[in-house]
Amino acid sequence: MAVVFALVFCGTWCGFPPDVRLGGVERRVTVPRLTARSWLDGAFAAAVEPWLVRNLGWRGVGIRTANQINTTLFRRQPGGARTTVMFGADGWLFEKAYVRERTHRPAFRPKGAEAFAADLDRLQQRCRQRGMAFAVLIAPSKAEIYPEYLPEPFRRLPPAVAAQTNAYQQLVAALQETDVACVDAHAAFLEWKREGVDLFPPGGTHWNHYGAQRALARAWQALREQPTARALPVLPAVAGHRLRAPVGTDNDLVHLLNLWTATPGGRRPVPFPVLDAAPASDAAIRIVMVGDSFAFTLIDALARTGIRGEVDFFFYCRRHYQVRLTGTRRERAAPTELGEIGFEDVVAHPRLAGANILLLVFNEIYTRKCGWGLPAALVAAGSGTGDAGEAGEHAP
């Protein structure tokens, strides 16, 4: 026991022996500077305790070991009621936020879907005026595509709830009254699901690489059909799939459980896309993506096609990722923080000028976010709300 305490003490203050990283996001805790005042008023002591909780040596080792014991021996879910992960049938894991949206089915406020669709329509028109292709890609929710793997109480919705029209359905209906190039990947996944190939991994919350590749192919088709995108290169077709061990986002929910070994679903092979030979093209494409975490796998899918160019991804309009596609690999620079909201930074960002493609990507559960306000801000910046000569100079 003394050896264990010594290791914990050394790990806390010296960083040796090294700890293991934990999955998930935690709020950073800092300790105030020790002064007579902070000592006497208790501020220092109050801050040290949460700091020790986060920085205790071998904390990660202890948490993973406790979670492994509780899961393996006692069949208890790690994290208890506070966890964001839900255990489903046959080793499938789900993120609670997506299950909650499925069971509550929140809708837009009156006329909200129509207003968002109108903003997207105006944004597409403005993009076309500048020779830029535009499309909206609505990513599906795993809980909506594979409800049969949810825990039994959540598999079938009560008739009254199932009859409700949620925000995603409202927006799709509103967009059908416009000319907006919209790829409804929810509907596409339900169609492709009948082919018998998994489109989501059991251990992850995002679409797998095979599903993302097919979604990209559908979105690229919608982009190339636009008059401003005739020169876009043809991407290699998805010829099939092969099974491989899950990697990266295939197991992002497994990583959140903080176990030493993956759950059974996290060890199951997942489909990976097989592409036809890439058509020869010297075109270098500049793509701007705005959206949520489903776009990361789309960028991976783009890199597999052999396309050359650059991708600027504005993640939730708060962080800017710049990716260079060389035709054989992708090179990603360190992300740039855009602030708490970042609308002004994104709207006036020089990387938007001269892009060939603007792609808005969001999961269906974020439909009511209205693109995090960016479509409306881009339209306002380019339509004379304020000084169009300044605000619209770098905006579509």
Where are these regions (language model features)?
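Extracellular glycan-modifying ectodomains
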Residues: 1-396
